[in-house]
Amino acid sequence: TGLKNLLDVAVLEGVDEEAARTLSGRWQKVDEIPFDFERRRMSVVVSEQADVHQLICKGALQEILNVSTQVRYNGDIVPLDDTMLRRIRRVTDNLNRQGLRVVAVASKFLPAREGDYQRIDESDLILEGYIAFLDPPKETTAPALKALKASGITVKILTGDSELVAAKVCHEVGLDAGDVVVGSDIEPLS
């Protein structure tokens, strides 16, 4: 995609340059469904063959799970059933407890077509996996929060991270997480 965030930059820094050149010579970008905060995901459509497109979607774990029906597991594609969902949750919750942000990646192949791809195309995906990133708080965060508290200022945190990541970060900077309110708690209020 033309728009890169820090997670994209981290992924690209970890890519083998020769492999990237080989892949970029074989694959062509066909379209893009941009990120938005409602879907919390974005997709690119690429093609290696003229008659087949591949939609690759990345985003917040729950949003990717919501549009996935299968998962690649030990090299096989299997149904994304309750057992697999529990396994995924166990692993990703553990990563979140360590303060790691998790971005999920899913895909599907489609017959090539003319015209733009839409949100509706982000369905019946195969969860390919997830990427965990450490985004540690800045060294100046804890002292700044301590100074605010000493001045009688109450700090509230608003984040797009998971509840578990937010709790870990709050702990690291000496901030009592207190009562946590998540987006699904607020949605009915609007």
State what each model feature region is.
Residues 137-149:
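The conserved cystathionine-beta-synthase
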Residues 1-127, 133, 146-147, 155-171, ...:
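Cytosolic catalytic regions of ATP/NTP-dependent phosphoryl-transfer enzymes
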Residues 152:
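Glycine-centered, phosphate/nucleic-acid-interacting loop/turn motifs that mediate DNA/RNA or nucleotide
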Residues 175-186:
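Conserved RecA-like helicase motor-core motifs
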Residues 188-190:
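Short, charged, surface-exposed secondary-structure boundary motifs
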Residues 131-134, 180-182:
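Short acidic-hydrophobic, aromatic-tinged amphipathic segments that line or gate anion-handling sites
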